[in-house]
């Protein structure tokens, strides 16, 4: 893979690691279809049903089947724990035949590493990672440059829930992310998939040019207990994308295991270049 130059402009005292993909990058573009289909992109933002390894093994086949049925082009997985090299998000990627990038600030020598994951079934040409300030457990943000038909699209993944979750800290992290996007997007259409503790009004104000895909942010966005703010969502650049639809990602009940809301999936259409420059 070819990391972006800005991914390397970090303080030398920080150990930001991007895991080796679980699979080789997909080499073939999506199956040919109508032109409108090639310009559509489906992006899921979710959390796994449990970060406990034993409980995860109880439900991972069910989650795998759910994502196999949904077939999102890109999956952002929040709050992933990698234990002794075992990564649940990359396990899913290996079964789905997606690539998997684990974005973390923890060094490889750490037994348990905290981060977020980016899964894609589209070809990935570049990726990068940066650290949002103030630093925290999940404050590493990542990006992938994907090939969608004849177009390149940037997908940024971040968890904007600083520790402590205060307005000044949220503003600082969001400002860091937007500055990084401005430095690395190279004018290409861009999305942000992640988890946001800011209110919807604050989120829209702090990410100019982007719009949340979720029409009803008051609804619970994930299974995580007590999460506040806007929650899991996909933000898209209004000058480059149009929202087609969004849907909740629901894990059905399975015997004694309850049904869970894992996140959301947005279906977006890439606008014509001529239309976006008028």
Regions found by a protein language model. Give the residues of each.
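Metal-dependent phosphoester-hydrolase catalytic domains
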Residues: 16, 25-33, 182-191, 197-278
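Active-site-proximal beta-strand elements of phosphoester/diester hydrolases
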Residues: 38-52, 128, 152-162
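Active-site environment of divalent metal-dependent phosphoester hydrolases
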Residues: 53, 82-86, 109-111, 163-165, ...
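N-terminal, active-site-proximal structural segment of metallo-dependent hydrolase catalytic domains
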Residues: 2, 8, 14, 23-94, ...
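Short, flexible loop segments at the rims of nucleotide/cofactor-binding pockets, characterized by
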Residues: 50-55, 133, 166-170
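Structured beta-strand-rich core segments of catalytic domains in phosphoester-bond hydrolases
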Residues: 56, 79-160, 247-251
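N-terminal signal peptide c-region/cleavage motif recognized by signal peptidases
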Residues: 19-21
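Active-site beta-strand/loop signature of hydrolases that rely on acidic residues for catalysis
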Residues: 42-48, 63-86, 119, 144, ...
